[in-house]
From Swiss-Prot:
Binds 1 FMN per monomer. Residues 4-190 form the Flavodoxin-like domain. One of its GO terms (cellular component) is membrane. Its cofactor is FMN. Substrate binds at W98. NAD(+) binds at Y12. FMN binds at residues 10-15, 78-80, 113-119, 134. This is NAD(P)H dehydrogenase (quinone). It comes from Bradyrhizobium sp. (strain BTAi1 / ATCC BAA-1182). InterPro entries: Flavodoxin/NO_synth, Flavoprotein-like_sf, Flavoprotein_WrbA-like, FMN_Rdtase-like_dom, NQO. Gene3D superfamilies: 3.40.50.360. It catalyses: a quinone + NADH + H(+) = a quinol + NAD(+); a quinone + NADPH + H(+) = a quinol + NADP(+). It holds the Pfam family FMN_red.
Length: 199
């Protein structure tokens, strides 16, 4: 059975919600799915004072586990147009896997969130995708089979490079049903692609 890892970092819960939607989509395709997060680097007192969501159910991933999956779908909120340092720090530890070619041929994808419509969604996706390409992975985005990314009647995320959500400047906007549908769609397509490639 196809094994999929949804790997994420979420400070305020928006990416956590998107990760769970991605996982739902991958499960719809018949995959076995694990949802894991990367370690928090912000000191506890600072995270609490900043109202980080610290009660996330997903277990902490270990870098050596990445080799166990047919597909890895990575999500993180943006930090000035690039992935959050927590995710970058985690992926930077994959040098041993890269050197052994342990991730070559696996399927990868990316999803993100920004505070505003023009807050760096696509550049953040590119920073994730660049890492995955260096690992030797085959990238699957959010293709236009998901027509919801072309909606003009509401504020919505979505890009051919990956599922996205817009949180609002104060973080009060949760992922919309359309954005969650995009995440589920991408998860399903990635799982289907991994099944075709890895059986």
């Amino acid at each position: 059975m196809t094994k999929v890892l949804v790997l994420y970092y979420s400070a305020y819960g928006h990416i956590e919600a998107m990760a769970n939607a991605v996982a739902e989509g991958a499960r719809e395709a018949g995959a076995t799915v694990d949802v894991k997060r990367v370690p928090e680097l912000v000191p506890d007192d600072v995270a609490k004072a900043s109202h980080y969501k610290l009660d996330q159910a997903a277990p902490i991933a270990k870098i050596e586990e990445l080799a166990n999956y047919d597909a890895i779908i990575v999500g993180t909120g943006t930090r000035f147009g690039r992935m959050a340092s927590q995710m970058a720090n985690f992926l930077d530890q994959a040098g041993g896997l890269w050197a052994r070619g342990a991730l070559n041929g696996k399927v990868g994808g990316a999803f993100t969130s920004t505070a505003t419509q023009h807050g760096g969604q696509e550049t953040t996706l590119f920073t994730i995708i660049t890492n995955l390409l260096h690992f030797g992975m085959t990238i699957v985005g959010l293709n236009y089979g998901f027509a919801g990314q072309m909606k003009l009647d509401e504020v919505t995320g979505g890009s051919p490079y990956g599922a996205t959500t817009i949180t609002g400047g104060d973080g009060s906007r949760l992922p919309s049903e359309n954005e969650l549908a995009g995440a589920r769609y991408q998860g399903r397509v990635i799982a289907e692609t991994a099944k075709k490639l890895h059986g």
